[in-house]
Amino acid sequence: MTMRILKIHYIVFILALFVAGCKSTDNAYLFTSFHEPATEGLRLLYSYDGYKWTDLDRTFFTPTVGSKIMRDPSMIQGPDGTFHLVWTSGWRGDLGFGYARSKDLVHWTDEKFVPVMAHEPTTVNVWAPELFYDGETQRYIIIWASTIPLRFPRGEEEENNNQRMYYTTTKDFQTFEPAKLFLDPGFSVIDAVIVKRAKKDYVLVLKDNTRPERDL
């Protein structure tokens, strides 16, 4: 897998699909979101051009696992049409992330907490899990940011905010491969997203979490 690490000023990660419930039959972009203090749950916005966005003005799913919050929701549609959703389920202290699935974006089932970092009990956080489907291996890849104190050189950040990217893979969201280190760029990093541009051409977009810039 060839990857390029890009730093850009801003990025919005969107999923192109049909917006359920809209009167138009045109394809649209769907934007997953949440409102602070992150206790309401999944919110969605849609756009036909990627520039002008309309809030669907409702909560589609309220989490009940982990610390019962939803931040950083990431959603992908699988080959069978099922929507898979993962999210940050706790600010600090949770050793995993939340998961649920849906066929129509309205009715969600199989909600659970996935304790991907349970084998590292000193882990401070599991933030911003991002989904990617690898059609070549027919597996879902989930990447996220975690801090394990004293695991890496501290650099500019405090020890409890020295983030690195980790990952797991799954075919069915029932069993998950043991979590492994995905990326150590030598500085604190969060909010990474995998984008496939062409066959064997992948891009990794990430946030340099080093203060004060915190650049993408």
Residue locations for each model-derived region?
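Bacterial N-terminal signal peptides
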Residues: 9-20
